[in-house]
């Protein structure tokens, strides 16, 4: 079938809006009509060429919501007309990782997903006879996309897709990092580095967890008002201080914060986030994705004196079994999604969404088909 799509043909070049061919879903696969998709920093990261797994030409997009229009052989968990969110972190329930109960990092489709193809090793997308790569198992920048059954969360059909599409990545990652990875407790102190979609979601999650002090850090003060609406108690611009930001936070709090979160993907900021953690028990969670070949560093003394350094993917959330509940929470107003959507636009304007992101003028732009 034909589908409108925004295709990244080359590194660093604007996406091209073209009509691609989408092959039918094969065994264990589902054809989904995407209704809305967010434009995430991870899409921009891959487009920039810094992503070590980046492949071109590719149909990007991984933060979407849509409706099932066709199912392949053997699919039982969803049917025609179901409302779904594609998942870049699958949940098969059968692999070693799923059965461990210790992680959400299912490996059922990981090997092929990282190669930009479906589980059988081939692509469902083509343009003028040329095969196009899939992206993170989702490819929501195409109006019609094919997704593995194990990579689909079935959601309440009454949910607003313009909002809940953000649960496909950023908001879930941030809130999940607070509850699942850091396990923030009432009264704990929190520092959040980077106030994009994920950082603001961490702030919101920390407020849900009843954290005592929530310190929001960004070099763009225009983001502070929304951070305070989300629950931040303090907002800091590192440019306003001569000292390293970790020293500023340690002096503000006495010994540092109970939990810090790096939501940017900058290895120097990752170090700052660790070193502002409380001596003896502070922990720092890396959420941001750094560029290819970059490494983190700190003095071992920082860890010997009780700090913990950890990371998280999709906030530790199991997509098929837990994401539907987060959709319900959003419908009850327990998770705020509307404030994240600063711009909405048609697919033809998708490159504007990247410009707004790079200029720091948006939290999330949502594309509607």
UniProtKB/Swiss-Prot annotation:
| EC class of the enzyme, as a word | oxidoreductase
- One GO BP annotation here? formaldehyde catabolic process
Q: Cite the binding residues for Zn(2+) 2.
A: 92, 95, 98, 106
Under the heading SMART domains, the entry gives: PKS_ER (SM00829)
The record's PROSITE patterns line, in alphabetical order, gives: ADH_ZINC (PS00059)
The cross-references to InterPro entries, in alphabetical order and at most eight, read: ADH-like_C, ADH-like_N, ADH_3, ADH_Zn_CS, GroES-like_sf, NAD(P)-bd_dom_sf, PKS_ER
Which family, according to the similarity comment?
Belongs to the zinc-containing alcohol dehydrogenase family. Class-III subfamily.
Query: Main role?
Result: Has high formaldehyde dehydrogenase activity in the presence of glutathione and catalyzes the oxidation of normal alcohols in a reaction that is not GSH-dependent. In addition, hemithiolacetals other than those formed from GSH, including omega-thiol fatty acids, also are substrates. Also acts as a S-nitroso-glutathione reductase by catalyzing the NADH-dependent reduction of S-nitrosoglutathione.
- Describe, as the record does, how this protein assembles with itself and its partners: Homodimer.
Q: What is this protein called?
A: S-(hydroxymethyl)glutathione dehydrogenase
Q: Identify the species of origin.
A: Synechocystis sp. (strain ATCC 27184 / PCC 6803 / Kazusa)
Write the gene name.
frmA
């Amino acid at each position: 079938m034909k589908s409108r799509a925004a295709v990244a043909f080359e590194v660093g070049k604007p996406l091209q809006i073209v009509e691609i061919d989408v092959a039918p879903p094969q065994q264990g696969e589902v054809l989904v009509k995407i209704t809305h998709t967010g434009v995430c920093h991870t899409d921009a990261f891959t487009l920039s060429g810094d992503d070590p797994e980046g492949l071109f030409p590719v149909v990007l997009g991984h933060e979407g919501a849509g409706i099932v229009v066709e199912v392949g052989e053997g699919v039982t968990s969803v049917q025609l007309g179901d409302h779904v969110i594609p998942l870049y972190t699958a949940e098969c329930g059968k692999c070693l990782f799923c059965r461990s109960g210790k992680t959400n990092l299912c490996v059922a489709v990981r090997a092929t997903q990282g190669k930009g193809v479906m589980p059988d090793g081939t692509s469902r997308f083509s343009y003028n006879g040329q095969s196009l790569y899939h992206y993170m198992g989702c490819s929501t920048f195409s109006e019609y996309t094919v997704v593995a059954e194990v990579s689909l969360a079935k959601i309440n059909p009454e949910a607003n897709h313009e909002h809940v599409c953000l649960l496909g990545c950023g908001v879930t990652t941030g809130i999940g990092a607070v509850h699942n990875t850091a396990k923030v407790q009432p009264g704990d102190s929190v520092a959040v580095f980077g106030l994009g979609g994920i950082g603001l979601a961490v702030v919101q999650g920390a407020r849900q967890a009843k954290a005592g002090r929530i310190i929001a850090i960004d070099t763009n003060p225009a983001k502070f008002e929304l951070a305070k609406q989300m629950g931040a108690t303090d907002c800091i611009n590192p440019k306003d201080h001569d000292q390293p930001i970790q020293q500023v936070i340690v002096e503000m709090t006495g010994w540092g914060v109970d939990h810090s979160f790096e939501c940017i993907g900058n290895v120097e900021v990752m170090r700052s986030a660790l070193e502002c953690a409380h001596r003896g028990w502070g922990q720092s969670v890396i959420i941001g994705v750094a560029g290819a070949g970059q490494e983190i560093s700190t003095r071992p003394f920082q860890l010997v004196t009780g700090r913990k350094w950890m990371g998280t993917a999709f906030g530790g959330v199991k997509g098929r079994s837990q994401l539907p509940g987060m959709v319900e929470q959003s419908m009850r107003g327990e998770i705020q999604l509307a404030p994240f959507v600063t711009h909405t636009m048609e697919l033809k304007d998708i490159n504007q969404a990247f410009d707004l992101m790079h200029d720091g003028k948006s939290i999330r732009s949502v594309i509607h088909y």
